[in-house]
């Protein structure tokens, strides 16, 4: 590819952000480009150091003289001086967009030309919203679904599945939507009611920032945790979003239990082929009965695992990179 893509992000964010999906996915994109680089606050090279007193464009020109970028992708763009005045096409990518005031303000104030939405329900909502608003320039919205890093999230045969049911991810998180992960919060207590012969475990969230997150240590540990369980419970949260765990768990060859997200209709139908569906409308007995059934019935559980592994082949970061490049070229 002859594309040249620059990713502007604070080095502190890059190095310490525990969730690595935003960086793994862009690194997959970079592999398909002729020219690519990270740059932003905290970065330095033999040529220059990012200067907070200079504009984004001035910092870009100083570090990359003569380079004509096809796309500049920004993370937290309003924290960088005059991101809006960058002369190249500007792109923002979003995992969650439930805080509408914040998101709309960031899109408008950053001067973004292209918005990549990782959740289909967000894509539909914001595309419709901005179609009704006349701004200084048109903004293009594209849907590129969440994917996962297949070199990390994969079956690890040497790890025995000694846990029958596990819960992973944040719980008891309050946002403007209320309890952000209602099913997970409920299940923390409910799985304790499973018969005593079953080994159940709640793995607390390790926190959003760690100085060594860039080593992928926490992502690898998370993949090992998933591999240690027969069934892992997650949920789509108050926004009903297709969170990354809906790819990471089945990609590890583990059965996933959770509720059905609101996303692209064909994708939702594929989800139902391998999901052990539990939801807030079910009573405690129904949920526990479903979990026990799939713990005890190995053949049925393995069938779901096989379906999940087949599904996730479409959501590697290699596939993300292909879709991302198609989106920016349309």
Task: Please report, for each region that a protein language model flagged, where it lies by residue.
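Residue-level signal for the nucleotide or nucleotide-sugar donor/cofactor binding architecture
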Residues: 244, 282, 315
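A charged, aromatic-enriched C-terminal amphipathic alpha-helix characteristic of glycosyltransferases
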Residues: 298-328
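Aromatic/hydrophobic pocket-lining residues that form the small-molecule binding cavity
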Residues: 222, 226, 287, 301
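Amphipathic alpha-helical repeat elements characteristic of tetratricopeptide repeat
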Residues: 216, 284-285, 302
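Short, contiguous hydrophobic alpha-helices characteristic of membrane insertion segments
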Residues: 256, 274-282, 323, 327-330
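Nucleotide-sugar donor-binding catalytic core of glycosyltransferases
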Residues: 2-251, 255-272, 318
């Amino acid at each position: 590819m002859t594309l040249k893509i620059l990713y502007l992000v604070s080095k502190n964010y890059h190095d310490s952000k525990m969730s690595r999906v935003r960086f793994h996915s862009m690194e997959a994109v970079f592999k398909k480009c002729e020219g690519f680089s990270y740059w932003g606050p905290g970065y330095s090279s033999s040529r220059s150091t990012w200067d907070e007193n200079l504009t984004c464009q001035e910092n870009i020109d100083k570090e990359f003289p003569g380079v004509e970028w096809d796309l500049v992708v920004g993370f937290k763009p309003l924290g960088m001086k005059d991101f809006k005045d960058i002369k190249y096409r500007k792109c923002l990518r979003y995992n969650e967009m439930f805080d509408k005031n914040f998101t709309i303000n960031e899109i408008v104030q950053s001067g973004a030309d292209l918005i990549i939405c990782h959740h289909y329900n967000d894509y539909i909502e914001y595309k419709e919203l901005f179609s009704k608003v006349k701004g200084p320039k048109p903004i293009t919205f594209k849907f590129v679904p969440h994917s996962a890093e297949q070199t990390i999230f994969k079956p690890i045969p040497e790890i025995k599945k000694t846990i029958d049911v596990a819960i992973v991810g944040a719980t008891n998180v309050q946002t403007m939507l209320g309890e952000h992960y209602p099913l997970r919060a409920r299940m923390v207590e409910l799985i304790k009611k499973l018969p005593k012969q079953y080994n159940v475990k709640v793995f607390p969230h390790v926190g959003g920032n760690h100085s060594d997150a860039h080593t992928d240590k926490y992502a690898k540990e998370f993949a090992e945790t998933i591999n240690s369980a027969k069934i892992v419970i997650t949920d789509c949260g108050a926004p009903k979003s297709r969170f990354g765990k809906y790819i990471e768990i089945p990609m590890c060859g583990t059965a996933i239990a959770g509720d059905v997200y609101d996303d692209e209709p064909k994708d939702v139908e594929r989800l139902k082929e391998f999901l052990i569906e539990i939801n807030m409308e079910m009573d405690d007995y129904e949920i526990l009965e479903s979990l026990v059934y799939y713990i005890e019935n190995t053949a049925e559980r393995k069938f779901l695992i096989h379906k999940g592994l087949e599904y996730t082949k479409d959501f590697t970061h290699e596939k993300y990179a292909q879709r991302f490049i198609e989106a920016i070229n349309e």
